[in-house]
């Protein structure tokens, strides 16, 4: 009964209104408000502040600054293996495997279209036909910045408007095409092993998504917005392996896509396995 009520609420609640309200609260600078929020969150999720660059929780100007906090330089070492594909974030592997018939596995009985995930872009979807994917759910208690799995040059960024369902096991198993229905930011890169997509998927109370090259992405609502990065439009953006790509103002999910025969996932990398940013999750085939 509890699960049914939760799922019913997912369909009835005003997703965007709640997320905007959460965003305003998370940016509040009133000391007693933001300190209460930060302390309650840190206590509930047992956040380890010893790894943070600023260890005192109340030193952050607002909750979002705390949530997207930087870590000490040695807190997330990068796997030095040549060709290693790095985990883009702290969290857990939700699913990983092959892209079959243009679809990505979501949960038992559910999958979603790569083309829909990428905002209906047929050409981009074709480049991942027969490829591989990994879905990483960001853990609330850990680090909330997203980093590059491989070095790459940004080719295109696509903002796809949509719903803001919560992202968890229950919704993954019960909301068809969850990740292709939620609002998301698609980042398409050229890498040494071919095309790579890094898709930042929003969720309920995820107030915004930010990238290091464009800041907070706030396109017109209800419209798919595309940015090309080449000499004719925006300057090319080159990011090294392990470099910060962006961050969630509150967390959600990152989906990685690679082309056919381009990656081999690490043995023993099981669904729900815990990850740290910078750990190797696979090996690239150049």
Swiss-Prot record:
Cofactors demanded by this protein: pyruvate
One Pfam family it belongs to: PS_Dcarbxylase
For the site Cleavage (non-hydrolytic), which positions are given?
A: 251-252
What does this protein's record comment on cofactor binding?
Binds 1 pyruvoyl group covalently per subunit.
**GO MF annotations for this entry?**
phosphatidylserine decarboxylase activity
Gene Ontology biological-process entries:
phosphatidylethanolamine biosynthetic process
> How is the protein altered post-translationally, as described in the entry?
Is synthesized initially as an inactive proenzyme. Formation of the active enzyme involves a self-maturation process in which the active site pyruvoyl group is generated from an internal serine residue via an autocatalytic post-translational modification. Two non-identical subunits are generated from the proenzyme in this reaction, and the pyruvate is formed at the N-terminus of the alpha chain, which is derived from the carboxyl end of the proenzyme.
Q: How does it assemble?
A: Heterodimer of a large membrane-associated beta subunit and a small pyruvoyl-containing alpha subunit.
Under the heading HAMAP family, the entry gives: PS_decarb_PSD_B_type1
Q: What is this protein called?
A: Phosphatidylserine decarboxylase proenzyme
**Gene for this protein?**
psd
């Amino acid at each position: 009964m509890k699960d049914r009520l939760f799922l019913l609420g997912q369909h009835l609640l005003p997703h965007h209104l709640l997320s905007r309200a959460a965003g305003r609260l998370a940016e509040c600078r009133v000391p007693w408000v933001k300190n209460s929020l930060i302390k309650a969150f840190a206590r509930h999720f047992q956040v380890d502040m010893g790894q943070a660059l600023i260890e005192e929780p109340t030193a952050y100007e607002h909750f979002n600054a705390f949530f997207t906090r930087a870590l000490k330089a040695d807190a997330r070492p990068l796997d030095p293996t040549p060709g290693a594909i790095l985990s883009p974030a702290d969290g857990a592997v939700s699913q990983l495997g092959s892209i079959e018939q243009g679809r990505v596995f979501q949960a038992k009985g559910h999958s979603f279209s790569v083309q829909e995930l990428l905002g209906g872009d047929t050409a981009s979807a074709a480049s991942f036909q027969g490829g591989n994917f990994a879905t990483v759910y960001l853990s609330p208690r850990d680090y909330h910045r997203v980093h590059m799995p491989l070095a790459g040059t940004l080719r295109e960024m696509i903002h796809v408007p949509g719903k803001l369902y919560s992202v968890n096991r229950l919704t993954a198993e019960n909301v068809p095409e969850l990740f292709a229905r939620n609002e998301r930011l698609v980042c398409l890169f050229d890498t040494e092993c071919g095309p790579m997509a890094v898709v930042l998927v929003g969720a309920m109370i995820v107030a915004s998504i930010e990238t290091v090259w464009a800041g907070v992405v706030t396109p017109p609502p209800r419209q798919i917005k595309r940015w090309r990065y080449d000499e004719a439009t925006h300057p090319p953006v080159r990011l090294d392996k392990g470099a910060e790509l962006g961050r969630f103002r509150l967390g959600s999910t990152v989906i990685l896509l690679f082309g056919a025969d381009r990656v081999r996932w690490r043995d023993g990398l099981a669904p729900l396995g815990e990850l740290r940013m910078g750990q190797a999750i696979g090996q690239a085939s150049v």
